Amino acid sequence: MKKILSILTVLCICGISAFAQNTAPKENIMKDKKVLVAFFSRTGENYNVGNISKGNTHIIAEMIAGETNGKLFQIEPVKPYPDEYRACVDIAKTEKENKARPAVKEDIAAEDYDVIFLGYPNWWGDMPMAVYTFIEKHDWNGKTVIPFCTHEGSELSGTERLLEQAC
């Protein structure tokens, strides 16, 4: 029994030290680049945790912007999606089936940036249609586009290839 407790103690100490924060200074690989972090995110009712005021993609976008000193830009449709989860899902499905391009509220001169992080939730195995609206407004030649996607287990679902085709 003592041997097992000793082994468990060592494993716990090793596990804790594995999570210790690295205090070495970070090299900013984006220091000479102008970075945009554009994202679409959903708030409102979430069937797992109730109502949320900030979506997962928004949270990740803020983290990326903080690490890269990038400009944060939220892609927002003119007509907001309903807060109620099922209603939002139904609208998103219809938009995808119709290849809709919902109008977005604002725009940003993406052409002025060298690196664009583009974030979106995976909706029906695709990007939300408002993201396509944003993509199709800009010239992506010579830009480095880095997608990031939030999902509930369906991974990127090939959206990185769709993004490559769209850009």
Predicted regions and their residues:
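N-terminal beta1-alpha1-beta2 submodule of the flavodoxin-like/Rossmannoid cofactor-binding fold
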Residues: 21-115, 125, 132
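Sec/Tat-exported extracytoplasmic proteins
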Residues: 39, 64, 68, 120, ...
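Short, glycine/serine-rich, charged loops/turns that create anion-binding
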Residues: 12, 42-45, 122, 152
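Bacterial Sec-dependent N-terminal signal peptides
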Residues: 1-23
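Residues at alpha-helix caps and immediate loop-helix transition turns in enzyme cores, especially N-
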Residues: 127-131, 158-159
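Short, glycine-/small-residue-rich phosphate/pyrophosphate-handling segment
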Residues: 146-167
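Short, conserved loop/helix-junction motifs that constitute active-site signature segments
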Residues: 110, 136-142, 165-167
